Curated annotation (Swiss-Prot):
It comes from the Bacteria. NCBIfam families: PRK01663.1 (NF002461), PRK13027.1 (NF009587). It is found in: Cell inner membrane. Responsible for the transport of dicarboxylates such as succinate, fumarate, and malate from the periplasm across the membrane. Belongs to the dicarboxylate/amino acid:cation symporter (DAACS) (TC 2.A.23) family. GO terms for biological process: L-aspartate transmembrane transport. It comes from Acinetobacter baylyi (strain ATCC 33305 / BD413 / ADP1). Its main location: membrane. One of its GO terms (cellular component) is plasma membrane. Keywords: Cell inner membrane, Cell membrane, Membrane, Symport, Transmembrane, Transmembrane helix, Transport. This is C4-dicarboxylate transport protein. It is a multi-pass membrane protein.
Amino acid sequence: MAKKPIYKSLYFQVIVAIIAGILVGHFYPSTTHVVDGVKEHIPGLGEQLKPLGDAFIRLIKMIIAPVIFCTVVSGIAGMESMKSVGKTGGVALLYFEVVSTIALLIGLLVINIAKPGVGMNVDPASLDTSGIAKYVASGQSQSTIEFLMHIIPETVVGAFANGEILQVLLFAIMFGFALHKLGDAGRPVLKFIDQISHVFFNIVNMIMKLAPIGAFGAMAFTIGKYGVGSLVQLGQLIICFYVTCLLFIFIVLGTISRICGFSILKMIRLIREELLIVLGTSSSESVLPRMLRKLEIAGCEKSVVGLVIPTGYSFNLDGTSIYLTMAAIFIAQATNTQLDVQHQITLLLVLLISSKGAAGVTGSGFIVMAATLSAVGHIPVAGLALILGIDRFMSEARALTNLTGNTLATIAVAKWVGALDKEKLDEALNNPAEVDRKMLEADRPAHA
């Protein structure tokens, strides 16, 4: 088979799109004019391209619920034993809790050593909090009980209509169990769901062709609205956060991957296209449907992939966990709020719960941060205004770390519950281009 020209690869197209987006945003930025003493915001071409990125994310979110439903149902209903489903869920939740706790601790450790907020001497009363009002309102409405109750949908249709991943996942698990109990009588339904999943994955392939356009629009908006110059003032926190994410990926996740018998670098190469799409869109959710199919081809059983990946988007957001601890302590440092060990332990315990409410979409981490500061009470919520402008620049590292963490979690859980084909995984890690080819072939309709 002739090798596909590089310009036709999604990998290359997304890189070009990101670079083009940065250039457009930089050379056609938004400006602010003062008219009669009133600041007037004039959006530049870069900011005006925001709908391109938003449209791509909406197209992906449109298909996530049915893809998850079909994947989970066919995975569970097709299993021989229901005990293995419970075992997989238990191992996954234990893994999520341990690894996300490590992520929170690493963020806490690094921010206390680097102290990027010390010396800013910001008076919380002087901050303009108008920009954070909607996040604070959203954050204050969340609680642990409400979050858990929210997992149970009021109606099945509502869960799908609103794109509530955990609600769809709960219904899919129940549907899969019920279908499994029917035995042979449920086979026609299972076959239909399996066939319709191919239709949904074909839609995903169609949408992914638009990924370069989405990445271009999202990147042009970010640079055009906030500008590269806006990074300078709070650059120390951004650098600190990016370095911490890299340390977490290559030390913590790297150690777990070695325990599982493979290299973290090879795994990153396997998901390089997805990482680039995430880099452009700042949302790890944008590649969720692709990851379901890719990890299945890479040797993980469908039932494991269907359970671990969607659940991980709420319970295993390592990048978001690092961000939450670092941002909270940074605000305390910048506003000269004294935090003793007891305060920091309280913050950690609150984050262990509140961080589970973040979804893999842009802005969710900021809402959880508002909820956390409101719950802790000691750190001024007004301090969120300090990081509002740079939050968008940190969302890329958050999303990339989240995706890497969830990919490893799926492979690790599959290995530990005996649901991993090691030969397929090795083949995928050594030849990622072949996996991408198989993904396209798997979703082509078979003609007799």
